[in-house]
């Protein structure tokens, strides 16, 4: 029974990731006035499965001078962490109802840095190492703003449990009252997942392919799956935090559909941003965070601390 539950949890996520790669190629294709994949299956719908078969049947190559154990562990760790983050998400029911769900997600997203660092260092390639160091610096930096934004949301929500956010947003979505935080959160998730215009870790013009330059076949596919699973989970988090997942507590199927549609819309905006904007320079990326986002998020956090005290009202869960 445990194995069946595990498969029912993992397989839909992997299918969603597979079709996200297809949607990305289609969206980018139409934005550049071309078709995108349209040969394998009707309208190219079987393209992700063809890619998976190709990648997992190829021989996984390994550089002669690489550190073998870390080189193998890094992609497995990346995919495991990307799949584990889904556990506490209420959609509208979570797999495990954690009291500290938000801290759990923050901790796991911090751990994903290790897989990137290990892969870059174990490859014994200068391009991979520079890409990994960039990714680590970028991820750790933007996690600061993400943590402060989460703290601000928790001050409004009154609990670290994700499920209570559904109750908090029954009458009004939090994006209405906290739109500056929502805006900074969305841009920070772009940087956190190493997406354009913050894809400095995979700067093709400078670093060939970034931290995964020495990976091929199965291990490369694992990194790829982890990256896209993180994109979907970050957009799911945005939906839960700011866009209220429930329409009516009695119609759970409708709530799930609403949650899926909002997450899909946010994910397509991710792809739209990739098609529209050029890559940031590294100093601009850091300047945006430390000089712009951090002071504003701290100010917003202080505002949300002082408001309930000033108006003598308390969050719903205390």
UniProtKB/Swiss-Prot annotation:
Function: Core subunit of the mitochondrial membrane respiratory chain NADH dehydrogenase (Complex I) which catalyzes electron transfer from NADH through the respiratory chain, using ubiquinone as an electron acceptor. Essential for the catalytic activity and assembly of complex I.
Keywords, alphabetical: Electron transport, Membrane, Mitochondrion, Mitochondrion inner membrane, NAD, Respiratory chain, Translocase, Transmembrane, Transmembrane helix, Transport, Ubiquinone
HAMAP family, A to Z: NDH1_NuoH
InterPro entries named in the record: NADH_UbQ_OxRdtase_su1/FPO, NADH_UbQ_OxRdtase_su1_CS
Annotated family: Belongs to the complex I subunit 1 family.
Protein name: NADH-ubiquinone oxidoreductase chain 1
Subunit structure: Core subunit of respiratory chain NADH dehydrogenase (Complex I) which is composed of 45 different subunits.
Membrane topology: Multi-pass membrane protein
Enzyme class: translocase
Localisation per UniProt entry: Mitochondrion inner membrane
Catalyses which reaction(s): a ubiquinone + NADH + 5 H(+)(in) = a ubiquinol + NAD(+) + 4 H(+)(out)
Transmembrane segments: 3-23, 68-88, 102-122, 146-166, 172-192, 223-243, 253-273, 294-314
KW Cell membrane (keyword) present: no
Record organism: Perameles gunnii (Eastern barred bandicoot)
Pfam families in UniProt: NADHdh
A single GO BP: mitochondrial electron transport, NADH to ubiquinone
GO cellular component, one term: mitochondrial inner membrane
EC number: 7.1.1.2
Source domain of life: Eukaryota
Molecular-function GO term, any one: NADH dehydrogenase (ubiquinone) activity
PROSITE patterns to which the protein is assigned, alphabetical: COMPLEX1_ND1_1, COMPLEX1_ND1_2
């Amino acid at each position: 029974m445990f194995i069946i539950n595990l498969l029912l949890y993992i397989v839909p996520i992997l299918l969603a990731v597979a079709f996200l790669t297809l949607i990305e190629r289609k969206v980018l294709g139409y934005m550049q006035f071309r078709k995108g994949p349209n040969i394998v299956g009707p309208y190219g719908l079987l393209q992700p499965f063809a890619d998976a078969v190709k990648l997992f049947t190829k021989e996984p190559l390994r550089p002669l001078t690489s550190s073998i154990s870390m080189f193998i562990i890094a992609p497995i760790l990346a995919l495991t962490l990307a799949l584990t983050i889904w556990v506490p998400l209420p959609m509208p029911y979570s797999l495990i109802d954690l009291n500290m769900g938000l801290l759990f997600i923050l901790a796991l997203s911090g751990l994903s840095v290790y897989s990137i660092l290990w892969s870059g260092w174990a490859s014994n390639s200068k391009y991979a190492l520079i890409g990994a160091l960039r990714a680590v610096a970028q991820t750790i930096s933007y996690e600061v703003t993400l943590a402060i934004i989460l703290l601000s949301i928790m001050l409004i929500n009154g609990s670290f449990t994700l499920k209570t956010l559904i109750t908090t947003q029954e009458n009004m979505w939090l994006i209405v009252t906290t739109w500056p935080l929502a805006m900074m959160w969305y841009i920070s998730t772009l940087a956190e997942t190493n997406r354009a215009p913050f894809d400095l870790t995979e700067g093709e013009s400078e670093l060939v392919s970034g931290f995964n330059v020495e990976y091929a076949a199965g291990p490369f596919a694992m990194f790829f799956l982890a990256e896209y699973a993180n994109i979907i989970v970050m957009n799911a988090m945005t939906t839960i935090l700011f866009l209220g997942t429930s329409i009516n507590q009695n119609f759970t199927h409708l709530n799930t559909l609403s949650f899926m549609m909002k997450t899909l819309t946010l994910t397509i905006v991710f792809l739209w941003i990739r098609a529209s904007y050029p890559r940031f320079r590294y100093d601009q990326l850091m300047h945006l965070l430390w000089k712009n986002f951090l002071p504003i998020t701290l100010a917003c956090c202080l505002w949300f601390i002082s408001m309930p005290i000033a108006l003598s009202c308390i969050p719903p869960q205390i």
